[in-house]
Amino acid sequence: MITVKPGCVTFQNVRKSFGAFTAIPDLSLSIEPGTLVTLLGPSGCGKTTTLRMLAGLEHPTSGRILIGGADVTMLPANERDVSMVFQSYALFPHMTSLDNVAYGLQSSGLGKKEAREKAEEGLKLVGLAGMGHRLPAELSGGQQQRVAVARALVLEPQVLLLDEPLSNLDARLRRRVRTEIRELQQRLGFTAVYVTHDQDEALAVSDRIIVMKDGEIAQSGTPRELYEAPASSFIADFMGEANVIPCEVIGVEGTEALIRVAGVDHRLPGRNAKAGMAKLAVRPGSITIAAAGQQGLAGRVLHSAYLGGHVEYEVETDVGTLFIIDHAVERNLPPSSDVTLGFENRGIALINA
């Protein structure tokens, strides 16, 4: 039987330099046992370097890394109680699925019979029972990914590390496999650290998301917290596309704020708002379109694109060009159409300047 012993993860003032370049200046974070935490950010933000330090594939220049309360800072990878699922899956092409899953168990000293029995259990766990005889080339991309997950899980690590595990799959398969990973993590309760640059993927699988920028934590929180209450323009735009609009907070009453955009006043949710200049992050689907001449923000359609279930517009306004998703496909506004824009109460966040 495969059992898990979920461990906590702690980084204490970790710094990582490559020659004169500092990839991680000063990183401190903690991950609770039994949670799936995603390191999210654009290329070069430091998320993969952070994962590699946790795996023991890189060592920090300074600082401490703890797994399950034990200091593993300078331990080699093979002495850490972690398993890693690589972006390429790293399956041995000449071995069957069963042998791939059993390989790590046998390398760690388990007898061949016991290793194969546990490997069969691992394949069953990921929905590949009866497919242990197949070579990697005889499996689909999604099945290969599940073999890689099974190989990692049978070692019963304190922490499972996943490095962009879905990047080699097509969009439809990515959605299915990310659901399978999340269901498996919740069912077994293991600790997982997941690296991706895909915001939708992070929102779908995570208990908590750590967004990184330039080797530092830009914001950490639940998927809902990051999407609905971004701490900066960078977070607002990175966690799903957002229009960032300059505005002025005229006043705040309870949870509602009076906001002025291009001379037009709006009453909108004002979480933690303060009077003064600010920025308004508005999701493309939270901008309303009405006929020209009404009260609101005047604009002119620059471009439109019909995408079946919705129409995408770029509209020029006094506060810049706004990107809008409109589900009223029958509206079908051609370029140069004059319109009036407004804001819904959902999908909007105030960011203090």
From Swiss-Prot:
In this chain, ATP is annotated as bound at G41, P42, S43, G44, C45, G46, K47, T48
Listed A to Z, the keywords are: ATP-binding, Cell inner membrane, Cell membrane, Ion transport, Iron, Iron transport, Membrane, Nucleotide-binding, Translocase, Transport
Q: How does it sit in the membrane?
A: Peripheral membrane protein
Name a single GO cellular component: ATP-binding cassette (ABC) transporter complex
Q: Where in the cell is it found?
A: Cell inner membrane
Q: Which residues form the ABC transporter domain?
A: 9-239
Q: What is its main location?
A: membrane
Q: Which reaction(s) does the protein catalyse, per the Swiss-Prot or TrEMBL entry? A: Fe(3+)(out) + ATP + H2O = Fe(3+)(in) + ADP + phosphate + H(+)
Q: What class of enzyme is it?
A: translocase
For this protein, what is the EC number? 7.2.2.7
Q: Does the keyword Transferase apply?
A: no
Cell membrane recorded as keyword: yes
UniProt GO MF annotations: ABC-type ferric iron transporter activity; ATP binding; ATP hydrolysis activity
User: Pfam families in the record, alphabetically?
Assistant: ABC_tran (PF00005), TOBE_2 (PF08402)
Q: Which InterPro entries match?
A: AAA+_ATPase (IPR003593), ABC_SmlMolc_Importer (IPR050093), ABC_transporter-like_ATP-bd (IPR003439), ABC_transporter-like_CS (IPR017871), Mo/tungstate-bd_C_term_dom (IPR008995), P-loop_NTPase (IPR027417), Transp-assoc_OB_typ2 (IPR013611)
Highest taxon listed in the record's lineage? Bacteria
Q: What does the subunit comment say?
A: The complex is composed of two ATP-binding proteins (FbpC), two transmembrane proteins (FbpB) and a solute-binding protein (FbpA).
Q: Which family does it belong to?
A: Belongs to the ABC transporter superfamily. Fe(3+) ion importer (TC 3.A.1.10) family.
Its biological purpose = Part of the ABC transporter complex FbpABC involved in Fe(3+) ions import. Responsible for energy coupling to the transport system.
Q: What is this protein called?
A: Fe(3+) ions import ATP-binding protein FbpC
Organism field: Rhizobium etli (strain ATCC 51251 / DSM 11541 / JCM 21823 / NBRC 15573 / CFN 42)
